[in-house]
Regions:
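Active-site nucleotide-donor binding segment shared across nucleotidyl transfer reactions
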Residues: 1-47, 214
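Short secondary-structure junctions
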Residues: 11-16, 48-63
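Short, low-complexity, polar/charged sequence segments that are solvent-exposed and flexible
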Residues: 34-36, 57-59, 93-99
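Low-complexity, flexible helical/coil segments
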Residues: 49-56, 73-75, 110-117
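Conserved catalytic core of two-metal-ion nucleotidyltransferases
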Residues: 54-92
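Catalytic cores of NTP-dependent nucleotidyl/adenyl transfer enzymes across multiple folds
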Residues: 79-197
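Glycine-rich phosphate-binding loop of ATP-dependent small-molecule kinases
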Residues: 187-214
Length: 214
């Protein structure tokens, strides 16, 4: 795994979006383990360098795996312009990235706060205590004059961020990514008809398949 990251470090602009502390731990990310969440500038280049293969037949899904001998490590490969985050935000994350002592590129503290809070508030059905605790820790160490966070306060921080950077929330290209519509509508979003249709059909087919199995 270390050799893989050394290769992409030299050839491809990327970050590991979260949970990078255990990236080299095969018990966490080995076969059947967690996914490594990647944001890269050039998805085709990342796939070419790593030899990543699709996990699913659906071309809109961004789930891949890379084989390391007997291990198959799963990657969720996000890329600039895919709507997983707003495009301008994806560029900011990559432009402001930093490198860990282990040689892995990750978001800087400010972009990590916003990327993780986006994931926790807009890509989960509800804000969990686990994410709130982590966001509070990042907030305390990153922003001046920190205070106690809750969902409403984080959404207000997001309204400021969107206004300051002239960004709109986007619909992800990957139809399997959860959208918390209640929170998305509070912030407003950039409408993309094709992605909404793709999402509708993906959910429809899932329901049909589920009924057929029963």
């Amino acid at each position: 795994m270390k050799e893989l990251f050394e290769l992409i470090n030299d050839n491809c602009k990327y970050v590991v979006l979260r949970n990078w502390e255990d990236v080299y731990n095969e018990y966490v990310y080995g076969s059947g383990g967690d996914d490594i969440d990647i944001l890269c500038e050039d998805k085709a280049l990342f796939i070419k360098l790593t030899g990543a293969k699709r996990l699913h037949g659906n071309i809109f899904r961004d789930n891949y795996f890379v084989a390391f001998g007997r291990l198959k490590v799963r990657f969720d490969i996000r890329w600039v312009g895919d709507g997983y985050y707003p495009t301008k935000m994806e560029r900011l994350i990559l432009e402001n990235r930093k490198q860990t002592e282990e040689g892995i590129f990750i978001p800087d503290d400010k972009e990590f706060f916003y990327s993780l809070s986006y994931h926790a508030l807009l890509q989960k059905r509800s804000l969990s205590d686990k994410y709130l605790f982590k966001l509070q820790h990042i907030f305390n160490s990153t922003f001046p004059n920190p205070y106690v966070l809750n969902e409403e306060i984080i959404l207000n921080k997001w309204k400021e961020y969107l206004c300051d950077n002239q960004i709109k929330i986007t619909i992800p290209n990957d139809p399997a990514v959860i959208i918390n519509w209640a929170n998305v509508k509070k912030l407003g979003y950039e409408k993309n008809i094709m992605r909404l249709i793709s999402r509708f059909w993906y959910r429809f087919i899932l329901r049909i398949n589920s009924r057929l199995k029963h």
